[in-house]
């Protein structure tokens, strides 16, 4: 009998340990305001169509984070659309690979950060404006970008345009109060090379969508390198009208990385703007659900971002007050200084601001695994099995959480001191303070130039 109880107790312990999750979503997420949205997402037979609109900074514009989010969110769904595309290289930005756009005639490009008073901007962040009627864009779509058949092409634009004669217009969407329109074409010859000409002086192009099927799951990522939330909020009235044009089921906002390094942050004004946008979108788009991901932990140029934790607090507070979903990516990574672990493990780029493909993929897996765990716990009847990649995510997080922080574990650097840069200081003034040439500080910190920033940590050699 005693042996029986010992075996039963051991089984109970093993069962309990199997239920323990490294990723305790309750600590850094709030999904209850997304209940109806998540039920639709994970009921594909009842709700076959589902649209996600993801807006943010360079983390979103890049390929890897959004690509992995799209793949994980669309599991067991019909996902036959590329999502929002823009020829970023045409406006001196980056990517996307596999989308070639050759511009002829006169075009003016711009984005939220570089307003020129000539071009307008949509939620995609970028635009191209034709200065004459002969302006043209020749497109080439490679299979590395979109492997499915290009049966449909959707275009966000303003003004009249001309497209190849083999393209038939199927649908043209306009929304009152929104300057942007969406035109959907049938590509009758399924070709991957076509031309788009401006049909009027002032024609504007905002984005492209490729599809082999117009039904099913859609994930549109609209990112802008260097973007801050305050850049987007400048046109809040336009955005709420454009949101009606998109009509998404779920909107995800991912800002805060660039603001975290802003040395001139008006914290009160920032939070008021966050609140204003949330209330406006709640009022104008009640059929959509909204979610925010907090910025990841970073350390660009060896600086501690002074407003990173402020961003996290503001977004969490306003999400709770306004009924938005929330995910604290900073905490899920491991909290303050966790960037050093991600860097050592090869997940983070050497700029200590962006992540490698493996890092972005892991972050996407963390977000979606957390959502799936919430759905399984809340609705046991939903057939959502735990996938192998979810267990692998748990294992990777366990190794990160239990790993010693390299910043604390590293031996002290011999013959060096640390100086935290203050506002107004230069390399020369710091060098004079310590009685050494500024070039010695440059060399000790691998600085290419003389630009330094408040909050940046510098090694000062003896």
Regions found by a protein language model. Give the residues of each.
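Bacterial Sec-dependent N-terminal signal peptides
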Residues: 1-23
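Membrane/wall-proximal cationic-aromatic binding patches
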Residues: 20-54, 108-109, 116
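Conserved, compact domain cores that house catalytic/ligand-binding motifs in diverse enzymes
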Residues: 48-56, 61-65, 216-321, 325-327, ...
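Conserved SGNH/GDSL esterase-like catalytic core that processes O-acyl groups on lipids
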Residues: 61-162, 176-272, 354
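Solvent-exposed, polar/charged alpha-helical surfaces in well-ordered, non-transmembrane soluble domains
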Residues: 63, 67, 71, 241, ...
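Short, surface-exposed beta-strand/strand-loop-strand elements in extracellular ectodomains
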Residues: 161-172
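Catalytic His-Asp segment of secreted/periplasmic serine-dependent ester chemistry enzymes
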Residues: 236, 298-407
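Primarily a LysM-type cell-wall glycan-binding module
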Residues: 402-443, 448-462
């Amino acid at each position: 009998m005693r042996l029986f109880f010992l075996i039963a107790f051991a089984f109970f312990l093993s069962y309990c340990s199997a239920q323990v999750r490294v990723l305790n979503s309750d600590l850094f997420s709030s999904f209850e305001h997304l209940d109806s949205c998540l039920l639709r997402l994970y009921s594909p037979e009842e709700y076959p169509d589902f649209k996600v609109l993801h807006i943010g900074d360079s983390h979103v514009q890049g390929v890897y984070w959004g690509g992995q989010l799209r793949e994980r969110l669309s599991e067991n769904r019909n996902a036959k659309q590329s999502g929002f595309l823009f020829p970023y290289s045409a406006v001196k930005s980056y990517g996307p690979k596999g989308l070639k756009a050759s511009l002829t005639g006169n075009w003016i490009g711009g984005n939220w950060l570089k307003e020129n008073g000539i071009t307008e901007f949509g939620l995609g962040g970028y635009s191209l404006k034709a200065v004459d009627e002969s302006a043209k864009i020749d497109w080439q779509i490679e299979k590395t970008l979109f492997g499915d058949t290009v049966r449909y092409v959707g275009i966000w634009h303003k003004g009249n345009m001309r497209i190849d004669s083999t393209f038939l217009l199927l649908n043209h969407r306009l929304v009152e109060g929104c300057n942007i329109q969406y035109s959907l074409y049938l590509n009758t010859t399924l070709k991957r090379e076509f031309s788009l000409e401006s049909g009027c002086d002032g024609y504007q192009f905002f984005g492209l969508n490729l599809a082999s099927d117009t039904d099913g799951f859609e994930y549109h990522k609209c990112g802008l390198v260097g973007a801050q939330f305050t850049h987007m909020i400048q046109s809040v009235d336009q955005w709420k009208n454009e949101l009606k044009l998109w009509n998404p089921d779920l909107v995800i906002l991912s800002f805060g990385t660039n603001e975290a390094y802003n040395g001139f942050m008006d914290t009160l004004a920032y939070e008021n703007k966050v609140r204003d946008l949330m209330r406006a979108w709640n009022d104008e788009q009640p059929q959509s659900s909204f979610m925010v991901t907090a910025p990841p932990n970073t350390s660009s140029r060896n600086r501690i971002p002074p407003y990173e934790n402020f961003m996290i607090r503001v977004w969490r507070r306003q999400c709770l007050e306004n009924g938005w979903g929330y995910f604290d990516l900073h905490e899920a990574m491991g909290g303050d200084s966790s960037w050093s672990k991600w860097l050592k493990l090869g997940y983070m780029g050497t700029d200590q601001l962006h992540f490698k493909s493996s890092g972005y993929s892991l972050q996407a897996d963390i977000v979606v695994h957390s959502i799936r765990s919430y759905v399984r716990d809340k609705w046991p009847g939903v057939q959502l099995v735990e996938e192998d990649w979810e267990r692998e995510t748990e294992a990777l997080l366990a190794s990160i959480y239990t790993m010693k922080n390299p910043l604390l574990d590293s031996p002290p650097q011999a013959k060096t001191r640390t100086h935290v840069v203050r506002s107004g200081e230069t390399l020369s003034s710091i060098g004079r303070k310590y009685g050494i040439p500024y070039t010695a500080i440059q060399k000790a910190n691998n600085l290419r130039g003389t630009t330094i920033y408040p909050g940046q940590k510098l090694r000062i050699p003896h």
